[in-house]
Amino acid sequence: MRTVHDDELKKILKIMSPGTSLREGLDNILRAKTGGLIVLGDNEEILDLVDGGFNINSEYSPAYIYELAKMDGALVLTSDRKRILYANAQLMPNQSISTFETGTRHRTAQRVAKQTNKIAIAISQRRNIITVYKGDIKYVLRDSAVILSKANQAIQTLEKYVAVLERVTNNLNILEFQDLATLFDVTTAIQRTEMVMRIVEEIEGYIIELGNEGRLISMQLNELVRSIEQDGVLLIRDYCYDKMEYNDVYKEIQELSAEDLLDLDIIAKELGYVGKSLIDTLVSPRGYRISNKVPRIPSNVIENLVGHFGKLKYILEAGNEELDQVEGIGEARARAIKNGLRRIREQVALNKNL
């Protein structure tokens, strides 16, 4: 499971992504060049800041807020964005709250957001941009065409990184079946997997911001990554030191800086190999990753299989009778595992010759 970064910002962007009725209303105001200040919140803390204006309490619609934004005051919407509570209201946040904004709307929006920890949106009349505030978060919404261009560039980059990862992984597969994998091969595969996943995270951010305009990008992403993260986690589980929790190791690798990720010795250290030569240290996989590729074998059976034999090489050497002794594996499943591993080995050898 990936560590969630900027979770609060992603939630905000989801609310305001293209295709939502709120974004439609904001875009209408933007095109009209009237400017606007909108607050999402109906709790007492927000309502105490409202001075004057009209208590509308009307159902929300993009057309309504477009018309109401023509007045100078702020609009107050319910947190679920289903009703418009106030229009043309003056907001009176605490003036001692620091803000580096210059325009009146933006200063008020930032202060309200900091004071109440609710979403405040300022639409600039002259600069033609939408700025969102919540707590200490400030984010300027970008045009969909700009985000789409960045997302397409990121997809192209991802394709190249996935191609490199596939080459590295296939090389590791060959070495694992021969029990000749070195620490260098393993750390390189983990490094490349993490690089791919970081690009995936960036693209997922673009998809959230694109809303319904990001469907094609989302389809391309799903086609490219498939089971890459799962394979990466199982790779760590195969090679991390016995007493280490593989999920904790995965989290530590996610927290590495871009510079540290380029250092294979640091990745080896995270796996528990301190002061070991990357090239000269032979390591044997436990077999979680390769066993997981055998079709129709439940995860609990794989746990029992690896728990019984300990290493992939012993699983490969085991006959049907030995496999049959493992809990959850009968005669039919033993044959399925043996044949499945044989087919995977043949496929790996075939890829080597391509």
From Swiss-Prot:
Keywords: ATP-binding, DNA damage, DNA repair, DNA-binding, Magnesium, Nucleotide-binding, Nucleotidyltransferase, Transferase. The keyword Nucleotide-binding applies. One of its GO terms (biological process) is DNA repair. It catalyses: 2 ATP = 3',3'-c-di-AMP + 2 diphosphate. Its cofactor is Mg(2+). GO terms for molecular function: adenylate cyclase activity; ATP binding; diadenylate cyclase activity; DNA binding. Belongs to the DisA family. Homooctamer. This is DNA integrity scanning protein DisA.
